[in-house]
Amino acid sequence: SDQLREEKMPALSRTLFDEYEINGNRLRYEAVYFKRREFLSAFGLASIIWHKKEDIQKLEYVIGEICSEGCWALSAHVKRLEDPNWRMTIDLTASETGHTLAQMYALLQDELSEETKKLIKTEVSRRILIPFMKAKAPAYWWEDATNNWNAVCCGNIGSTAIFLLEDGAEKEKLLSRIRYAIETYYLEGFGADGACTEGLGYWGYGFMNMVVFAMDQR
């Protein structure tokens, strides 16, 4: 965070987002996108560990920037010509963003301003929780998939609900749906030897998110 404090958070632009549709280049947009997530993670962790006022202030600025983005999904994962609600696309990174913000909301209750906490609840609910809960299962292609997308998206949504939703029937219904998707479909993608055909990197990515969700339920 000390290094990033001296840097300016890069801005996402419509021009960069459009590049994937125009020429197939997704890397320039993603470089900026993930740099912004680096700011979020760095100042979030610094705030959680050290609780310094300057880190909290910087984090609140970064959260405001993230919440002002037009779409949390990557440009390569949306279908603007087919889906009028493409800005609400829930992909790997959108679900991760929601989970990260929800976790910061829960762990920094006493440090974050009421305005920032309200912003987090509003945007994460609008972009992640409400669309998922309103859609009849399996509403997304990854919800009944046997690859890492299932565990990453489902796991992050489940953890987001744990941190943001009040205990009750609505929350339990969502968590039951998540557990069913992971246990019924994702785990079917593994062979008897515990391996998957996606490769080691994807195995770790999906399994890690499943384990994090399991731990968040404890």
Residue ranges: model-predicted function:
Residues 35-49, 61-65, 95-107:
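Non-membrane alpha-helical segments in proteins
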Residues 1-21:
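Low-complexity, Ser/Thr/Pro/Gly-enriched N-terminal "stalk/linker" regions
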Residues 82-199, 212:
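Active-site lining segments of carbohydrate-active enzymes
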Residues 201-218:
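Repeat-solenoid scaffold signature
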Residues 14-32, 75-89, 138-145:
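Internal amphipathic alpha-helical repeat/solenoid segments
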Residues 46, 59-69, 73, 104, ...:
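Alpha-helical solenoid scaffolds that mediate protein-protein interactions
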